[in-house]
Amino acid sequence: MQESLINSSFKYCEDLTKKHYENFPVASLLIPKDKRKYIYAIYAFARAADDFADEPGIEGSKEKRLALLDEWNGKLNDCYTGKAYDPIFIALSATVKDCDIPKELLESLLNAFRQDVKKSRYENFNEVLDYCKNSANPVGRLVLLIFDIQNDEMFGKSDKICTALQLANFWQDVKVDLLKDRIYIPEDDMVQFGVSDVDLVNKNDSSAFRNLINFQVERTEKLFEEGKELFELLKNESKSKRLIFELKLTWLGGKEILNKIKAIDYDVLKTRPKLNLFDKLKLIMKTII
């Protein structure tokens, strides 16, 4: 395939990535330039698929959204057989070839998006964790693979951090997800704390609800701490010095979202906590020092 076409496809993915707000850095300047393009390609692949599952601009039934995801899966298959034509998949095809990315990790992301279409309630925390295994954990593993790191212990610690990041996003986005008729707070926890779906829809900001979110935040903080050892493990990898800074910045960003939730006394029904520019600069300083 022509190098100019591959380069323009990577640029397309970069432009798409930079248009979207995220809590956490996506291929920041801490990532070496030669690695950054691969992260842009993976992000663009996942971002588009996520839009199929979520965005209101797509008309039609659940079946229509699932059909779009199946079509995306077909294009993923094509990129593994050298038949990619879409800019995202041209860039992704180069990425999976250069970084030896197993298709199963990318398919896991698509399975999470399918689940978003099919499922809107979770009976218990284990169900939520199972969702995170597809929606979040592959991302950390993909980043490690881009840096040519294949280590089961590191993968395990990365999974802890990625799950925690996904959970932090859930508690941050309770208000947003309700608009999509989606609740990630485990139903058995809601029963335990005396909170119903109706309470959430009516934005009933009770002490019971705040205690419920406090409980979710505390269990998420434990996962962040359990994954923190990844940074020490990575210090033994000469090729990952800058990656450590990137991952630590991401880790701090997730922790800061939880701090923002605490600062509003867990009232995520009325307010969506968000990192501002000052917060991000502060986190960068913490990462470097």
Predicted regions and their residues:
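Catalytic cores of Mg2+-dependent Asp-rich isoprenoid enzymes
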Residues: 1-166, 171, 175-289
